[in-house]
Amino acid sequence: ILTGDMITRAARRAGLNAELVFVVDNADPLRKVYPFLDASYEEFIGHQLGAIPAPDKDGKPDWERFENEGWSYGDHFLAPFLEALKQIGVEPRLIPNLTSYREGKFASSAKKACDDPGAIREIIERVSGRELPKDWFPWQPLDSKGSLDGLTITGYEYPLVMWTDQYGENGQSDITKGEGKLPWRLDWPAKWGFNNITCEPFGKDHGAA
């Protein structure tokens, strides 16, 4: 983000109309129960960071603040980062990714991907040199408990992706309402589009196939 800030400042000095934005990836899932979390967070593995409660001082889910203020896990860990940026004069405009999904801003890109998953698969496999799972699909629905993990896609008819989850429940995900998300390789360019991003510094890990 500091590289982005330097580019923004340089662009402004050159007379360009530039703005620094920071996309908050709070639609991404909780990967595991980290050492600072209570074991009760086990139930939230696979759930989106912007949709689960933040930990309290004991590492337990702070349900009261989540229900009263909407203070999420993502908010909790974003706050000190933003404060540190503010101290050095960096104040980007924030774009919560989960909000963008829920507002339907990913709908057009999601439709393009879901309408032709074979083309997406071919590109990823050709560029990366690896084979995707046979059940791979370019949309990750939320299951019956709100997790992105353990689902099998059973069908697609715009705007609905049909699924069966690990609990044996069947359901459908509306790609226009953010009832799931795109895999990161598709999420990334999609948000460039509707956020009008023209430049984004990134690490070599993101540049790898």
Question: Where is each model-derived feature located?
Answer:
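N-terminal Rossmann-like or analogous alpha/beta NTP/dinucleotide-binding catalytic cores
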Residues: 1-121
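Alpha-helical recognition segments enriched in aromatics with Gly/Pro capping
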Residues: 116-122, 126-209
